[in-house]
């Protein structure tokens, strides 16, 4: 009897040990989604478009060159891909005055067009728009065809150079004379309003934009920072209050998640346009709806890249 009890005790101990041993995890439990790189093995027809069927105007780019000679390579890439003209936006993060941005591109004439920033230095001191308008006129005389890229992600136009426009939203009354001057000079305004909607949502397992959202998450807790809807209100105010001025909302107005709403705004405001730059992934989530939207509003939609200057990018 003792032998049986000893044997049973030993067996139970062995089973217990087996249960506590950690089993090796399979690849589905250890592979990070960020590292997942599936290779498509489906034998289906594929189309690679290497050159645009019709000449293309890229309405949203920046001064990406590190040296003047890089402009030559950029033009070669444009020629190879059928890009007739590129519009270069000026922002605070460019780091150079407007006239210095233009200089390296001069030999290519109309292959490049330039948009200027706004100087808010005086406006933020005493509310006057005089110096801002004078700078706008100066840039226009030098060749600026528009204003932008402005950028308001909640705290005002922080893309402006040389003075960032903290607290200056696009519907600020102090800017109204500037928008009137833009209309007079036929200079449209390109503005980056907010960020993609899912960046404002909880960064958890339900967020379908989590990989980017976790990195670029919008901190709306900053002082006087407007949220997504608050920013959309400022943009609509500007459209309504300045009907003679053209406003271009870049990146689909960051409204890819609600194309019916975006379309309704285009229907309501004839002075509103959008560009499609830097939102390929967001548009790809709803390919059929996006296609229908682009066809319906093709006269109000501008092509743009905002993503470098290589042929591969185009």
Model regions: which residues?
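Sec-dependent signal peptide recognition
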Residues: 2-8
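C-terminal motif of bacterial Sec signal peptides marking the signal peptidase cleavage site
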Residues: 14-17
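An N-terminally biased module of ancient metal coordination in phosphate/nucleic-acid-related enzymes
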Residues: 20-107
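Active-site gating/metal-coordination segments in enzymes
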Residues: 27-31, 44-49, 99-217, 270, ...
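Acidic/histidine-rich helix-loop elements
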Residues: 58, 62-69, 123, 161-163, ...
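Acidic-and-aromatic substrate-binding clefts and catalytic sites of carbohydrate-active enzymes
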Residues: 63-71, 89-98, 121-130, 169, ...
């Amino acid at each position: 009897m003792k032998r049986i009890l000893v044997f049973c005790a030993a067996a139970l101990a062995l089973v217990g040990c087996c249960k506590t041993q950690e089993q090796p995890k399979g690849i589905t439990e250890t592979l990070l989604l960020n590292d997942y790189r599936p290779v498509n093995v489906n034998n289906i027809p594929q189309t690679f478009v290497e050159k645009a069927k019709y000449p293309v105007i890229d309405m949203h780019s920046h001064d990406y060159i590190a040296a003047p000679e890089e402009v030559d390579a950029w033009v070669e890439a444009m020629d190879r891909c059928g890009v007739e003209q590129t519009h270069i936006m000026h922002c605070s993060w460019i780091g150079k005055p407007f006239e210095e941005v233009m200089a390296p591109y001069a030999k290519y004439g109309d292959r490049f067009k330039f948009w200027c920033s706004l100087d808010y230095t005086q406006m933020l001191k005493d509310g006057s728009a005089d110096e801002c308008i004078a700078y706008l006129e100066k840039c226009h005389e030098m060749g600026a065809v528009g204003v932008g890229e402005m950028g308001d992600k909640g705290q005002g136009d922080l893309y402006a150079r040389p003075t960032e426009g903290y607290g200056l939203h696009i519907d600020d009354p102090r800017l109204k004379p500037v928008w009137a001057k833009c209309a007079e000079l036929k200079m449209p305004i390109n503005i980056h309003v907010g960020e993609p909607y899912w960046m404002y949502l909880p960064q958890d397992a339900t967020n379908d934009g989590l990989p980017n959202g976790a990195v670029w998450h919008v901190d709306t807790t900053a002082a006087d920072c407007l949220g997504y809807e608050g920013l959309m209100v400022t943009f609509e105010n500007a459209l309504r209050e300045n009907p003679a001025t053209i406003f271009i909302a870049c990146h689909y107005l960051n409204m890819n998640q609600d194309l019916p709403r975006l379309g309704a705004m285009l229907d309501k405001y004839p002075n509103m346009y959008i560009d499609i730059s830097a939102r390929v992934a967001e548009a790809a989530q709803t390919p059929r709806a996006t296609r229908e939207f682009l066809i319906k509003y093709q006269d109000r939609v501008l092509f743009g890249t905002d993503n470098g200057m290589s042929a591969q990018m185009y």
